[in-house]
Curated annotation (Swiss-Prot):
Family from the record: Belongs to the UPF0297 family.
Record protein name field: UPF0297 protein Sez_1866
NCBIfam families assigned to the protein according to its UniProt record, in alphabetical order: PRK05473.1 (NF003997)
InterPro entries recorded: IreB (IPR009309)
Domain of life the protein comes from: Bacteria
Signal peptide: none
Organism: Streptococcus equi subsp. zooepidemicus (strain MGCS10565)
């Protein structure tokens, strides 16, 4: 796969943003209830793509797999920047 020197645009629908946020919250709580470190497990999943980082408990694994990992990363970056006073257009 070749790479280009051109900047590529990536866009995520506003409705998906809200659903990803709700899904991450639900997955976080499921991981916490099972005694895992939710942050470590979510990071493991996002970096590797291995769904084994997220348990089937409360259907958490199926919920998080509804979204591409790049969509999850985009929502996490957006949330972080907005929380630090950056005006996201």
């Amino acid at each position: 796969m070749g790479f280009t020197d051109e900047t590529v645009r990536f866009n995520l629908d506003d409705g998906d943003k809200k659903q990803i946020s709700e899904t991450l919250t639900a997955v976080y709580h499921s991981l916490d209830e099972k005694g895992y470190n939710p942050i470590n497990q979510i990071v493991g999943y996002v970096l590797s793509g291995d769904p084994a980082y997220v348990p089937r408990y409360n259907d958490a694994r199926n919920q998080i797999r509804k979204y591409e990992r790049d969509e999850i990363v985009e929502e996490l970056v957006r949330y972080y920047l907005q929380g630090n006073g950056i005006d996201i257009r």
